[in-house]
Regions:
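Class I (Rossmann-like) S-adenosyl-L-methionine-dependent methyltransferase catalytic domain
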Residues: 1-49, 54-98, 122, 142-235
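Helix-loop segment at the mouth of the active site in Rossmann-fold oxidoreductases
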Residues: 99-101, 118
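A conserved beta-strand element that flanks and buttresses the S-adenosyl-L-methionine
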Residues: 110
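Short catalytic micro-motifs in class I SAM-dependent methyltransferases
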Residues: 113-117
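A short glycine-rich, Lys/Arg-flanked "PGG" loop and its adjoining helix->strand segment in the class I
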Residues: 125-137
């Protein structure tokens, strides 16, 4: 992907999530069971980063663990909502490609449904390397992305954008799509960028960033809805 276009998509993603912030919070007020289960990787006394925290809902399952929680997101409106919902937590607007933290700062980093919104292999790798930079040696990256290949409606989008790419009508990379966000009345508010990772593609990318992959599996509300990966920063 052309880097100029990738930068445009990063800016577009920020604008899109500001546009849908209230709708997003309304439809994601609860914490699904698969995310609750990922909470088991955080322990008392640890510094934990919620990278791409959105409305802060991960904090709901971590707040009683006596951890030092930090939440960051590119959307100012989502951070405002998170601060209103959880005034005791630390939230700030920040870019996950250039984190405002020192090296070896965190014990754990949660990346829940974020990496698939990062355009281009260059920026995806930069995101992971930046996570590695701020993780302590031996620290864990807990990662989830959507498994578009197991979602029927999403698979149709893959076919559509693959066709557009083949006939030179798309600046996106192969396996990239735009997913419409609709209001309750059915109006399209935003067309969000996603990269449709495969299970092995995700694992290979995480390894390329210098992590050791401990576990990689499919799961979710329906079988195969998401891809999960636990990676360790080498000692």
């Amino acid at each position: 992907m052309d880097i100029e276009y990738a930068n445009y998509l990063l800016e577009k993603t920020t604008e899109d999530y500001n546009l849908i912030a209230e709708d997003y919070t309304r439809t994601r007020a609860y914490v699904p069971e698969d995310i609750r289960d990922l909470g088991k990787y955080a322990f008392a006394g640890e510094r934990v980063l919620d990278s791409g925290c959105a409305n802060g809902r991960l904090y709901e399952i971590l707040k009683d663990k006596e951890i030092n929680y930090f939440g960051i997101d590119i959307s100012k409106k989502l951070i405002q909502i998170a601060n209103q919902k959880y005034p005791k937590a630390k939230f700030q607007t920040a870019d996950a490609l250039n984190l405002p933290f020192s090296e070896n700062f965190f014990d754990k980093i949660y990346s829940i449904s974020i990496l698939h919104n990062i355009p281009s292999r260059k920026f995806q790798l930069q995101y992971l390397k930046e996570a590695s930079r701020v993780l302590k040696p031996g620290g864990l990256l807990i990662l989830r992305v959507w498994d578009f290949w197991r979602r029927k409606a999403a698979f149709k989008l893959i076919l559509k954008h693959t066709f557009l790419k083949l006939i030179n009508r798309s600046k996106l990379d192969f396996k990239d799509v735009f997913v419409p966000w609709k209001s309750s009345g059915g109006k399209i508010i935003a067309e969000r960028y996603f990269h449709c990772f495969t299970k092995m593609e995700l694992e290979n990318l995480v390894k390329k960033a210098g992590f050791k992959v401990k576990k990689n599996w499919r799961g979710g509300k329906d079988p195969g809805t998401n891809i999960y990966l636990i990676a360790k920063k080498p000692l």
